């Protein structure tokens, strides 16, 4: 699962950590066998160049997320910047999550590996439920 389109993935993980259950609700367009979407990575502003270099070494292509309604980059509620990182098909999301977490200056990334207790996908035929 990749989250962070709204740049709140760090906060979402804090909420998950304090909740008894983490349930994801999505539409069918979000379902995929292999993750191949950009991974948001929240970084400390001063660490951005180093984090970008390390992401590149991991095979990613980091891009600083620009704000849509103001000049400059997106700044999260906690003051982090967001790098949108393209990795292509992510065959081992757990390994990539661990590698990203190990980079100094990374506040949090949008890979939610083995965190959801249940996933509800709404379809035209009803709801598909996957429990962990």
Indicate where each model-derived feature is located.
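Conserved phosphate- and dinucleotide-binding cores of soluble alpha/beta proteins
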Residues: 1-132
């Amino acid at each position: 699962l990749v989250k962070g389109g709204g740049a709140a993935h760090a906060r979402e993980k804090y909420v998950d950590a304090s909740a008894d259950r983490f349930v994801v609700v999505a539409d069918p367009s979000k379902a995929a066998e292999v993750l191949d979407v950009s991974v948001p990575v929240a970084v400390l502003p001063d660490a951005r160049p180093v984090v970008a270099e390390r992401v590149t070494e991991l095979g990613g292509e980091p891009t600083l997320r620009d704000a849509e309604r103001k000049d400059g980059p997106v700044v999260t509620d906690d003051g982090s910047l967001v790098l949108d990182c393209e990795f292509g098909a992510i065959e081992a999301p757990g390994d990539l999550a661990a590698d990203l977490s190990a980079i100094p200056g990374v506040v949090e990334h949008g890979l939610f590996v083995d965190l959801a207790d249940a996933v509800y996908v709404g379809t035209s035929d009803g709801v598909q439920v996957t429990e962990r």
